[in-house]
């Protein structure tokens, strides 16, 4: 089995756990609250990254375009979409991108696109 095939299988079987390996993110244990916590962890990570960038480039730093390579279910793409004009999420697994699309629709982000690599 190739790694691409493995990621496709993870995306079908256990997409959130494949991104953050905490048992509460397993498909059979994922509650609505756990999913919200999962997505909130992405927002915290994006805030940390943007704060670091602003420390280097100045408080005015605002990304125009973001590439989320290995975007999985959109954990980082979605909060980046609130900050940037355009976000592109790329992943080797169509199953992960399908879940990212659902999450993106639920979060009402329209400036995000994706593709399989």
What are these regions (language model features)?
Residues 1-32:
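N-terminal, positively charged/glycine-rich alpha-helical extensions of SAM-dependent methyltransferases
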Residues 1-4, 42-46, 93:
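A structural signal for well-ordered alpha-helical scaffolds and beta->alpha junctions
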Residues 67, 75-117:
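Class I SAM-dependent methyltransferase SAM/SAH-binding core
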Residues 27-44:
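Short, contiguous, helix-prone interaction/anchoring segments in small proteins
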Residues 62-70:
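Conserved class I S-adenosyl-L-methionine
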Residues 40-63:
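Conserved alpha-helix/loop element of class I SAM-dependent methyltransferases that forms part
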């Amino acid at each position: 089995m190739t790694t691409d095939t493995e990621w496709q299988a993870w995306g079908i079987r256990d997409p959130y756990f494949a991104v953050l390996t905490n048992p509460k993110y397993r498909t059979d244990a994922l509650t609505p609250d756990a999913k919200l916590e999962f997505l909130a962890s992405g927002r915290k990570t994006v805030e940390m990254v943007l704060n670091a960038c602003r420390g280097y480039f100045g408080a005015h730093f605002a990304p125009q375009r973001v590439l989320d390579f290995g975007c999985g279910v959109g954990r980082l793409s979605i909060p980046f979409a609130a900050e940037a004009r355009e976000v592109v999420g790329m992943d080797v697994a169509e199953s992960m991108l399908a879940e990212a699309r659902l999450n993106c629709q639920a979060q009402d982000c329209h400036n995000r696109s994706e593709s399989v690599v």
